[in-house]
């Protein structure tokens, strides 16, 4: 079955997310530490209100100003652990590493995701950087995330965007409890899609 039949009817495309300036600085606003949580809460609610949603399709963005060896390490790590073996989607002009793949392979010698993740986090910090927040969040959301490669977005500041697909029912339990189950507990009426969801979304029509 092709991606058009198996995935597209049950997939929500994730648009570009942006954290408001008021929430980007922890020192100025303590609520900023919850900005990403709010994003996941919204996606969790979406899966409850729209139970036919099985997949999230979107992209992770990195900027050309990010240190090159760090970018290559992140992309190599993602490919090693999340590469789409089925080639469901491929970039027309895929982005290549700027450092030899053999050099990157020698860095990630862990036996599993957790060991390699610790290596990645350590090496990126040694460079004086952090793993980009959204990239870090996505790679820790589901062990079966599919990675579709990376390409340059010429129409959006030459950013480097990596395509991903996440199966909703394979989101890690801790994330599910935090962002999906919590919504159901607070809004049980959302489970009754035809009778309750609209009242939840459009309170003035309740």
Give a label for each model feature:
Residues 101-206:
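Intrinsically disordered, low-complexity, positively biased terminal segments
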